[in-house]
């Protein structure tokens, strides 16, 4: 059985080799290669097991081999990756948070163009991709080129783009998904091509296509429909010639721009070197050479336009040689002229120009058919830069530039071909004059700067944007929809207010989880309440890295297109100091807010290997070695983090405690500036009325470090029918429970409730009277404590750092020793019950809260800090 399959594969190899070397294959090879990528790769990877079951190993091998044959291993790998994404191409839009932003892409990503292109055709890549990149950069745009077969990289590039140009791509599922992603992000799209490959009816009438086998011909015509769908899916189109533009208009595309091929700096340099080295005056012999750069055998039919005339010129002028560069089947009119025909195989571009420069006359015959009206005049341009006169067919691209008899000849029929070639053969002066005129014409008209300014700039002008407001880029480990932690809540709120009320444009860089649709370190752009967010998927195993080098490149790209004036780093966990390295590389000043002990301690909250707060103020790195397997990590980490923190133009702390702790450890040349975190102001003035019951609340999560065990044990000993305990379990909103039923069932009057957010925070605090906050670690701020006091909720807290700075003992809360056990917490609870029982029903509970800062206060303070560095 295996031997039969191997023999079948050998047969397939031989058959494919025969096809590949046939004239018909070479005629439409660029289209066929794309079709193979489309049709054979669809099932290659994602559905491989099913294919083998249904079709057998033999057909599976044939599929894989045809893809490999069309483009080699690189194409096979790209195709596999591309099609493994097929099941996920729509899943981004299925995520609620990945929404349609309110701003236009070019107002976010400044002057950034992505070209998603078919790159397998060397000449097309040179003239339509590489040249365009050079011209865009000349105009002040950043330009990135991506293969259309790389779905994920293409999608990532779209997030960074003002404009996306799809060059010569078909309408695969992945390409259409990329176009949809552009629409989601308000990115303008252009579909570009330099051949009339999108009109089935015109291709069907082409003599070249008619020569193909019925199977291949069917594939080519199907390909035309695929290209047409891609053309119509984009906003606008770009054509290489006026004839091609007219065909695009005829398909229903309203806005079509013409962008001609031009002479890039590399080509001009190459031409100049060839001219200098050969000094055309030094001829290789006394022959006069007519040259035809036929390239592939697709030009057999085109050559018929001039074939008999050229043969006649050769017969009447024995000193004339006909040089062919590439593949060409000569008709019978050339019989007996072998001595006057010289052939050169397909070669590199530099060798092609050298062979061209050795000749005297260039020809560009093209069949008089609408398909060729789309062709560019590149043969005329290439001949002109090496100072050859040309005779060309009367198609639009040539008529547009050639002044007949001055800088070239136009030949409409065999008589004109013979007459005009004869004039050039017989008169050296005519050849020289015409060559100089042609050279002058193309250097003036087709130089990169000229084409960039006259043809490309009108295409991209509307998407060129300059900053009108100062731009701040903000780094934080989490962001909506993953609004985890107090620092994240603070960051979200102040960003929104800075942008809305202080005239800044704020851009956020945060982490996202990696999954099937979100690949590691390939950012996705979305929007939260008017603020642009770049979510960088970071693998779980990298979230603990303090120096995540993989983050540098994606962050650098974001900075490159956003062009911020200042960066503000909040919590860098997950992102790491690599984000700051990107700022340094781009010469962007940055401010750091130290929201916790991450800058001081390998363990973010200074929790030692026993799960307890380590108790250090002045950090002793020798003690830190007990918390890590690698003894070198603490000192290395400390040195690196100090370097980046000292490079900050200012370091902020949310509380005096946090500022003093970092100052004690000399983390920055200047004392840290206290920038007290704000909280959300209550929607209305909340004056509580005592209703006879006392409800205690705990929101710290089911973890001993936050004191959950103290709360449960203390309250189990509280015997008062008027006292209730309400525990917030944030996991409920995620479909889980963090408190088993048996843990709380033995506690009287205890209920578990889902977590709250900034939209229903008032409702939660209105439902409790006292907040329990018996933290066993030092808190840098204590957002929940301040939210409670602002809403007239009494607080019982341990002496845990920044938390206590808003507590007025006995007036809005109680501070118990940091080392308190459950008994001390129980005593504090009973004391508060006694205090509240002294109130009468309906008495007001209005606690002092003057030390509380709101988000508006913090934004005012940050505005002043930012302005000092702008």
Model-based region annotation:
Residues 120-139, 263-358, 692-739:
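Conserved catalytic-core segment of nucleotide-activated headgroup transferases in glycan assembly
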Residues 402-415, 423-428, 809-810, 814-822, ...:
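Conserved acidic donor-binding segment of nucleotide-sugar-dependent glycosyltransferases
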């Amino acid at each position: 059985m295996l031997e039969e399959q191997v023999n079948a594969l050998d047969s397939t190899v031989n058959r494919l080799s025969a096809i590949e070397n046939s004239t018909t294959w070479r005629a439409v090879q660029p289209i066929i290669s794309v079709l193979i990528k489309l049709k054979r790769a669809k099932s290659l990877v994602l559905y491989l097991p099913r294919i083998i079951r249904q079709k057998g190993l033999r057909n599976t091998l044939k599929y894989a081999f045809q893809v490999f044959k069309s483009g080699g291993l690189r194409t096979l790998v790209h195709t596999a990756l591309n099609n493994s994404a097929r099941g996920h191409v729509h899943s981004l839009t299925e995520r609620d948070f990945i929404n349609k932003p309110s701003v236009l892409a070019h107002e976010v990503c400044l002057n950034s163009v992505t070209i998603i292109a078919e790159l397998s055709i060397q000449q097309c890549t040179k003239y339509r991709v590489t040249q365009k990149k050079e011209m865009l950069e000349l105009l002040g745009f950043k330009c990135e080129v991506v293969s259309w077969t790389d779905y994920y990289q293409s999608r990532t590039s779209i997030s960074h783009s003002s404009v996306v140009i799809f060059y010569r791509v078909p309408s695969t599922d992945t390409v259409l998904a990329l176009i949809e992603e552009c629409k989601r992000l308000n990115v303008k799209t252009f579909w570009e091509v330099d051949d009339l490959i999108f009109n089935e009816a015109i291709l069907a009438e082409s003599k070249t296509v008619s020569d193909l086998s019925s199977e291949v011909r069917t594939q080519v015509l199907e390909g035309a429909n695929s290209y047409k769908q891609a053309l119509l899916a984009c906003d606008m189109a770009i054509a290489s010639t006026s004839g091609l533009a007219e065909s695009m208009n005829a398909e229903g595309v309203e806005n079509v721009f013409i962008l001609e091929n031009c002479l890039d700096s590399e080509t001009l340099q190459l031409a100049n070197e060839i001219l200098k080295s050969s000094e055309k005056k030094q001829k290789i012999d006394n022959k006069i050479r007519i040259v035809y750069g036929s390239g592939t055998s697709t030009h057999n039919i085109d050559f018929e336009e001039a074939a008999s005339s050229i043969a006649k010129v050769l017969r009447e002028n024995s000193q004339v040689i006909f040089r062919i560069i590439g593949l060409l089947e000569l008709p019978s009119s050339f019989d007996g002229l072998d001595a006057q025909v010289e052939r050169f195989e397909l070669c590199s571009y530099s060798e092609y120009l050298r062979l061209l420069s050795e000749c005297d006359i260039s020809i560009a015959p093209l069949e008089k058919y609408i398909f060729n009206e789309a062709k560019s005049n590149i043969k005329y341009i290439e001949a002109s830069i090496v100072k050859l006169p040309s005779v060309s067919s009367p198609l639009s691209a040539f008529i547009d530039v050639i002044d007949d008899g001055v800088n070239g000849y136009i030949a409409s029929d065999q008589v004109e071909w013979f007459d005009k070639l004869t004039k050039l053969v017989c008169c050296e002066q005519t050849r020289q004059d015409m060559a100089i005129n042609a050279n002058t014409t193309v250097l003036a008209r087709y130089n990169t700067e000229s084409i960039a300014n006259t043809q490309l700039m009108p295409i991209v002008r509307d998407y060129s944007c300059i900053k009108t407001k100062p731009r701040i880029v903000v780094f934080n480990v989490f962001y909506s929809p993953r609004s985890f932690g107090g620092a994240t809540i603070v960051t979200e709120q102040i960003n929104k207010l800075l942008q809305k009320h202080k005239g800044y444009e704020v851009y956020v860089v945060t982490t996202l989880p990696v999954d099937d649709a979100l690949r590691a370190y390939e950012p996705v752009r979305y929007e939260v309440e008017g603020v642009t967010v770049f979510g960088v998927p970071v693998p779980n195993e990298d979230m603990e890295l303090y120096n995540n080098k993989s983050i540098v490149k994606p962050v650098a790209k974001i900075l490159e297109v956003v062009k911020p004036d200042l960066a503000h780093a909040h919590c860098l966990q997950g992102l790491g100091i690599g984000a700051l390295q990107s700022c340094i590389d781009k010469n962007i000043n940055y401010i750091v807010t130290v929201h916790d002990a991450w800058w001081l301690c390998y363990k973010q909250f200074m929790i030692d290997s026993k799960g307890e707060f380590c108790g250090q103020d002045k950090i002793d790195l020798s003690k830190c070695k007990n918390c890590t397997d690698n003894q070198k990590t603490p000192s290395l980490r400390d040195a690196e983090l100090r370097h980046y923190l000292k490079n900050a133009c200012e370091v902020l702390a949310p509380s005096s405690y946090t500022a003093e702790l970092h100052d004690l450890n000399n983390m920055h040349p200047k004392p840290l500036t206290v920038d007290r975190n704000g909280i959300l102001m209550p929607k209305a003035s909340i004056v509580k009325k005592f209703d006879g019951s006392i409800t205690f609340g705990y929101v710290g999560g089911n973890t001993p470090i936050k004191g959950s065990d103290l709360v449960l044990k203390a309250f189990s000993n509280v015997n008062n029918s008027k006292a209730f305990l309400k525990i917030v379990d944030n996991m409920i909103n995620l479909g889980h429970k963090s408190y088993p039923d048996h843990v709380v069932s033995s506690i009287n009057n205890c209920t578990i409730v889902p977590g709250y957010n900034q939209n229903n925070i008032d409702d939660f605090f209105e439902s409790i009277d006292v907040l329990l906050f018996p933290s066993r670690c030092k808190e840098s701020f204590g957002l929940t404590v301040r939210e409670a006091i602002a809403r007239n909720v009494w607080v019982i807290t341990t002496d845990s750092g920044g938390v206590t700075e808003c507590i007025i003992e006995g007036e809005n809360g109680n501070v118990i020793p940091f080392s308190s056990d459950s008994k001390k917490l129980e005593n504090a609870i009973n004391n508060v019950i006694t205090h509240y029982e002294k109130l009468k029903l309906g008495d007001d509970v209005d606690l002092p809260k003057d030390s509380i800062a709101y988000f508006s206060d913090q934004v005012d303070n940050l505005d002043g800090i930012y302005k000092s560095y702008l």
